[in-house]
Swiss-Prot record:
It catalyses: 3-hydroxyanthranilate + O2 = (2Z,4Z)-2-amino-3-carboxymuconate 6-semialdehyde. The keyword Iron applies. It is found in: Cytoplasm. Pfam families: 3-HAO. A divalent metal cation binds at residues 131, 134, 168, 171. O2 binds at residue 50. One of its GO terms (cellular component) is cytoplasm. InterPro entries: 3hydroanth_dOase (IPR010329), RmlC-like_jellyroll (IPR014710), RmlC_Cupin_sf (IPR011051). Keywords: Cytoplasm, Dioxygenase, Iron, Metal-binding, Oxidoreductase, Pyridine nucleotide biosynthesis. It comes from Aspergillus fumigatus (strain ATCC MYA-4609 / CBS 101355 / FGSC A1100 / Af293) (Neosartorya fumigata). The lineage of its organism: Eukaryota, Fungi, Dikarya, Ascomycota, Pezizomycotina. This is 3-hydroxyanthranilate 3,4-dioxygenase 1. GO terms for biological process: 'de novo' NAD biosynthetic process from L-tryptophan; anthranilate metabolic process; L-tryptophan catabolic process; quinolinate biosynthetic process; quinolinate metabolic process. GO terms for molecular function: 3-hydroxyanthranilate 3,4-dioxygenase activity; ferrous iron binding.
Amino acid sequence: MLPPALNIPKWLEENSHLLQPPVNNYCVYHPSSPATAGYTVMIVGGPNARTDYHINTTPEFFYQYRGSMLLKTVDTSVSPPVFQDIPIHEGSIFLLPANTPHCPVRFKDTVGVVMEQPRPKDAVDTMLWFCKKCGEVVWEKRFVCTDLGTQVKEVVEEFAADQEKRTCKACGTIAETRYQEGEVVQPPRFLE
């Protein structure tokens, strides 16, 4: 028997405490469940201000349920890399192509849904940090993603705990693990 549809307002009312930093997400449909056909569906809340970029070998589908978010992306096929910010407003959807470095920045009282298709067997995810002074990659970690909810958090914490990993080899700038107050501004469409 199939489960009932998920009512997002009711789920948030009962479970918003599960959206905790540093990732602020909860997998409502886990890929290990036979009913999901390997898909991952997450509810993600704000605020978060992590500076890491994630590379997934499959596309990611974003639906912004409440408020606006900013999806920071990088085109690494050119040198120097080109950084592009994509606002995703309440009620909007966005399909991020596979293998695109991205950093989803969510603001206070915002909620989104992210869906990832099944990863190919032994697909390698990458998390990386760019130097905000020179644009070079400061550090990256590759891993086979078996549990997005825990593995991303572990990599973020590993980077945060090691100043050597956070130091840019090109210019010596120490990378921050969070954006500073006012450094990233919520897209203006739904500001109060």
